[in-house]
Amino acid sequence: MSSGKITQVIGPVVDVEFGSDAKLPEINNALIVYKDVNGLKTKITLEVALELGDGAVRTIAMESTDGLTRGLEVLDTGKAVSVPVGESTLGRVFNVLGDVIDGGEDFPADAERNPIHKKAPTFDELSTANEVLVTGIKVVDLLAPYLKGGKVGLFGGAGVGKTVLIQELIHNIAQEHGGISVFTGVGERTREGNDLYWEMKESGVIEKTAMVFGQMNEPPGARMRVALTGLTIAEYFRDVQGQDVLLFIDNIFRFTQAGSEVSALLGRMPSAVGYQPTLATEMGQLQERITSTKKGSVTSIQAIYVPADDYTDPAPATAFAHLDATTNLERRLTQMGIYPAVDPLASSSRALTPEIVGEEHYEVAMEVQRVLQRYKELQDIIAILGMDELSDDEKILVGRARRIQFFLSQNFHVAEQFTGQPGSYVPIDKTVHDFKEILEGKYDEVPEDAFRGVGPIEDVLAKAKSMGY
């Protein structure tokens, strides 16, 4: 192990000098430094980011640099940060370095570990399947279905329900799927991670789940690399065990945000809106590894925060290019009390073709979108002149569109404690059948309010009956 000395500490950036004759550590190598805290030696991991010349390197700390001083000895480990992989990770909670943070016993020193930096699978190793992943959420299954082994992005501004939707997907898919799941919390609230951990523990899903967290209070180095830690654990199950893995990431924007902080600290010239010039490269390196190969599949569901609800912001715009399906959450729908607040016209999926979902499903989905689009066009006329100016056919269409809009809402299992209503899981065939009947006008006389926050059409009729219809 070659060793050097700290020459400068500026926040999470630490400069280390190895001397002009010494062997310099490679980029992305992990360095170790021990700091003295009240007589106890504490290990801090640094990752090499730049070579400055004259035997010096600039590193990013993965933990707080409080207590580091100039002159402290730094050791080069000779390899990248590596984290535990395999069966032993299931049911456990880790940080970016693969250290256990759930209060349980540490991993043995000889546990199998993999480096967090590796190349994406080659072109000939990739595999594409065209099987729909049923979520039990009507608006998703009908209008923007997910693919097994595909990549899904949940886009939305602050407070429109991304994390609740991802938790419902964990509830519905992880419990039905029965396979292995990896949840990665990137720069989000610790409270949400804690809630999710206890929910998973109560439901028993934790036994088949590995959880990795680098939350809001962590230094930018940890937030930037924690997504790679979760991905490394998922890749092992895919490549070595040939498993079909579910990878949940909340939130990809925080990965970009941390990269932006690190880039500024390293002195790189910012690009558009102050983001790092390497934004597309960093996103590509992460996203290209999240893929399905001939050995196994990774189905990833990623929450992506949209700053100020601006979809043209470089961070969400860069992520768009990598996804098979997008679920767009809309603030206007939350204001109408429609949850999940999924925009049925803006959400998209490459799975919505007759070859993949079938002719009937495709036709019903297209007709639902046509009715909603026409309703959107008529809203200006209604706002200015009122409903009376519409033709009879248009009045019928508006009534159906409003019923469809409300019927796209649904009660969630994970929101039961807030709504007081039990959650509902609707099979995809039932969803298609129910929307087809609404489009045919079978429920034109049922009050609109009966369609809010329900599961299948039977719930609507029961609700209408209780309302005295």
Swiss-Prot record:
Identify the Gene3D superfamilies for this entry: 2.40.10.170, Bovine Mitochondrial F1-atpase, Atp Synthase Beta Chain, Chain D, domain 3 (1.10.1140.10), P-loop containing nucleotide triphosphate hydrolases (3.40.50.300)
Q: Note the coiled coil stretches, chain numbering.
A: none
Q: Which reaction does it catalyse?
A: ATP + H2O + 4 H(+)(in) = ADP + phosphate + 5 H(+)(out)
- Pfam families found in the cross-reference section: ATP-synt_ab (PF00006), ATP-synt_ab_N (PF02874), ATP-synt_VA_C (PF22919)
The places in or outside the cell where this protein is found are: Cell membrane
Can you tell which superkingdom this protein's organism belongs to? Bacteria
Q: Which SUPFAM superfamilies does the UniProt record give?
A: C-terminal domain of alpha and beta subunits of F1 ATP synthase, N-terminal domain of alpha and beta subunits of F1 ATP synthase, P-loop containing nucleoside triphosphate hydrolases
Listed A to Z, the keywords are:
ATP synthesis, ATP-binding, Cell membrane, CF(1), Hydrogen ion transport, Ion transport, Membrane, Nucleotide-binding, Translocase, Transport
Q: What are the protein's GO molecular function terms?
A: ATP binding; ATP hydrolysis activity; proton-transporting ATP synthase activity, rotational mechanism
Listed disulfide bonds for this chain? none
Q: How does it sit in the membrane?
A: Peripheral membrane protein
Q: What is its EC number?
A: 7.1.2.2
One GO term describing the cellular component:
plasma membrane
Which residues bind ATP per the record?
G156, G157, A158, G159, V160, G161, K162, T163
The protein's matches in InterPro entries, at most eight in alphabetical order, are given as: AAA+_ATPase, ATP-synt_VA_C, ATP_synth_F1_bsu, ATPase_a/bsu_AS, ATPase_alpha/beta_chains, ATPase_F1/V1/A1_a/bsu_N, ATPase_F1/V1/A1_a/bsu_N_sf, ATPase_F1/V1/A1_a/bsu_nucl-bd
- Does the UniProt entry include the keyword ATP-binding? yes
Q: What class of enzyme is it?
A: translocase
Q: Is Nucleotide-binding found in the keyword set?
A: yes
The text of the family note is: Belongs to the ATPase alpha/beta chains family.
**What's this protein's function?**
Produces ATP from ADP in the presence of a proton gradient across the membrane. The catalytic sites are hosted primarily by the beta subunits.
Its subunit composition reads: F-type ATPases have 2 components, CF(1) - the catalytic core - and CF(0) - the membrane proton channel. CF(1) has five subunits: alpha(3), beta(3), gamma(1), delta(1), epsilon(1). CF(0) has three main subunits: a(1), b(2) and c(9-12). The alpha and beta chains form an alternating ring which encloses part of the gamma chain. CF(1) is attached to CF(0) by a central stalk formed by the gamma and epsilon chains, while a peripheral stalk is formed by the delta and b chains.
Name of protein: ATP synthase subunit beta
Q: Which gene encodes it?
A: atpD
